Amino acid sequence: MRCSHKLGRFLTPHSCFWWLFLLCTGLSWSFADGNGDSSTYQYIYNLTICELNGTDWLSSHFGWAVETFVLYPVATHILSLGFLTTSHFFDALGLGAVSTAGFVGGRYVLCSVYGACAFAAFVCFVIRAAKNCMACRYARTRFTNFIVDDRGRVHRWKSPIVVEKLGKAEVDGNLVTIKHVVLEGVKAQPLTRTSAEQWEA
């Protein structure tokens, strides 16, 4: 578990890290020097969505694909501010779609780069989903506040205030003799005792 925690912290600096890197690469393509025969020019071209322009899948819809490619990471980043796990899922989904399109179109360099990013985003999603499930399980099955009576029975108790009647505590309508009170997982000590009066009309 410790290894997975470090891996998740390494891979998730931000939800849109991989998208931002690839977007900057695409912008740098516009300012690259040289002509179409330049190896640097061609290398940068292979790493952007422009590589899909000649495929059958995207040749007739390239305009909206570019708009989606720019707006999609912005949307996932905004989503990550409140829903990080969902953002990781959509990151993996979007990157996987580009990788699949590259594989179908025979653009294997593009496919491998985006596939690696999609896999990293999916790993982040799995780690976050596992942590969410563990947190939900802990919240539903682990209780840190409870009362132990003189018979060894454990009673759930949320309040730091215990009401006593005839020297016993009233728990769920029953009177029990307190042996220990545990708050936030730590054995508690009585702080103050206050007498109370009950009035009826």
From Swiss-Prot:
Membrane-topology descriptor: Multi-pass membrane protein
Maturation and modification: N-glycosylated.
Signal peptide: 1-32
GO cellular component, as recorded: membrane; viral envelope; virion membrane
Virion surface topological domain residue ranges: 33-63
Positions of transmembrane segments: 64-84, 109-129
Glycan-bearing residues: N46, N53
UniProt keywords, alphabetically: Clathrin-mediated endocytosis of virus by host, Disulfide bond, Glycoprotein, Host-virus interaction, Membrane, Signal, Transmembrane, Transmembrane helix, Viral attachment to host cell, Viral envelope protein, Viral penetration into host cytoplasm, Virion, Virus endocytosis by host, Virus entry into host cell
Subcellular location: Virion; Virion membrane
Record's function text: Major envelope protein present in abundant amounts in the virion envelope. Mediates virion sialic acid-dependent attachment the sialoadhesin receptor SIGLEC1. This attachment induces virion internalization into alveolar macrophages predominantly through clathrin-dependent endocytosis.
Quaternary state and interactors: Heterodimer with the membrane protein; disulfide-linked. This heterodimerization is required for transport to the Golgi complex. Interacts with glycoprotein 4. Interacts with host SIGLEC1; this interaction plays a role in virus entry into host cell. Interacts with host B4GALT5.
Family: Belongs to the arteriviridae GP5 protein family.
Name of protein: Glycoprotein 5
